[in-house]
């Protein structure tokens, strides 16, 4: 166990809550102490859902540990069923409650409730949130997706159909992605049978085998369930996530091949503005910009591909907190001659960003904080995210409109960086500097200029002025390199010559 102020993933029961909150007619009874009810805030405050997640807590206290906590759980489960009347009841323990080993599954089955009871058993001190979401969805699919009364081959099919799998509550732009993918499939001539878990009920899960194939949009949640559907119901899988123009074309071709359709009408160059925008004049200065990428495996791998192939960036670092997909991450990093950073410690990520000094950071909410501290432009590409990344507007990441959103989200921080650099350049002008009075008020009173004096090395005024002319998003790197150069050579004062000598030294 590790004490930290930030975690990329919560415990497994938070993943189970994400699945339960995404679905209809499902309720989750969680054996947990009072302190574990914090997870409600993730859905009501951050995702801004209009209702609480469908979760009932036993909320036992320390004094209850001397009594019968098993009876408390059974009473809570019975009351939850009578109040909410779900069609499926999930039962499990939080990480803390696992220690008292009350067996919620056995206790709930002993109640004889007239609905399926699905026990969720996690190794809470070894596994995390995405594992919990994946296992919960897998157990639900296994419980309800039984054999069809009529085989698919004998049913009349006016058009092929598919299931969209993996979208959950608290997912990064999942709601908007589903809308875009559904519209694209409709244009291609493919119907959507069921979208799950998001918006699905237990009755909908029973209809999953009716589709001709499954599309795994978010492997962290849906891959295990989709593999089971493939083995049990002979449903092929589409594993390409349509993030970026190239991946969307590959996705269309893969779906069309399974559905027996012609993909060419949807492969035209005018479907997305990203390709032209990335070649346009105001974007040419972006070519070769060094970018550091960190997030869940699905979005991190896709971001690296889009950054390198479609925007002309150089991938300087690539990593993920998704240990279950470490093999895929390492294979993706090898394409850019990198070693993948697989960690859930934000301090390691911060140290890597500081070491690499990229010009753009693509990551989670924590990378946004890190980049802000280091003065580096940043865009969020992956959960976990804060409230601003659950926008009221339509803002997908997938398909052609998602590619447009990606271009705006990633490139605009760099463009604003250039604009701010120009403003900073003119602050040193005798007419436009910060201390200058408005021109109609006459001559401004001269004020003393503060000189930045580090603890060890001093900069003369000329070197400070020259440093300010460097774009702010690489200014920190220039300062550090110059000070390191001066320290190594025992120079007590940094001048303009020192600044340029250091630049030449580190450019070799």
From Swiss-Prot:
- Entry annotated with the keyword rRNA-binding: no
Gene Ontology biological process: light-independent bacteriochlorophyll biosynthetic process; photosynthesis, dark reaction
The gene behind this protein is bchB
Cofactor(s) annotated in UniProt: [4Fe-4S] cluster
Alphabetized UniProt keyword annotations: 4Fe-4S, ATP-binding, Bacteriochlorophyll biosynthesis, Chlorophyll biosynthesis, Iron, Iron-sulfur, Metal-binding, Nucleotide-binding, Oxidoreductase, Photosynthesis
What does the UniProt function comment say about this protein? Component of the dark-operative protochlorophyllide reductase (DPOR) that uses Mg-ATP and reduced ferredoxin to reduce ring D of protochlorophyllide (Pchlide) to form chlorophyllide a (Chlide). This reaction is light-independent. The NB-protein (BchN-BchB) is the catalytic component of the complex.
- Record flagged with keyword Lipoprotein: no
The catalytic residues are 282 (proton donor)
Task: Tell me which species this is from.
Answer: Methylocella silvestris (strain DSM 15510 / CIP 108128 / LMG 27833 / NCIMB 13906 / BL2)
- EC number(s) on file: 1.3.7.7
Q: Which positions are annotated as binding substrate?
A: 417-418
Q: Its domain of life?
A: Bacteria
Q: Which InterPro entries match?
A: ChlB/BchB/BchZ, LI-POR_suB-like_C, Nase/OxRdtase_comp1, P-CP_red_C, Protochl_reductB, Protochlorophyllide_Rdtase
Q: What class of enzyme is it?
A: oxidoreductase
Name the chemical reaction catalysed here. chlorophyllide a + oxidized 2[4Fe-4S]-[ferredoxin] + 2 ADP + 2 phosphate = protochlorophyllide a + reduced 2[4Fe-4S]-[ferredoxin] + 2 ATP + 2 H2O
Q: Its annotated pathway? A: Porphyrin-containing compound metabolism; bacteriochlorophyll biosynthesis (light-independent)
Protein family membership: Belongs to the ChlB/BchB/BchZ family.
Details of cofactor binding? Binds 1 [4Fe-4S] cluster per heterodimer. The cluster is bound at the heterodimer interface by residues from both subunits.
State the oligomer form and interacting partners.
Protochlorophyllide reductase is composed of three subunits; BchL, BchN and BchB. Forms a heterotetramer of two BchB and two BchN subunits.
The residues listed in the UniProt record as binding [4Fe-4S] cluster, with positions renumbered to this chain, are 36
Q: Report what the protein is called.
A: Light-independent protochlorophyllide reductase subunit B
Q: Which Pfam families does the annotation name?
A: Oxidored_nitro, PCP_red
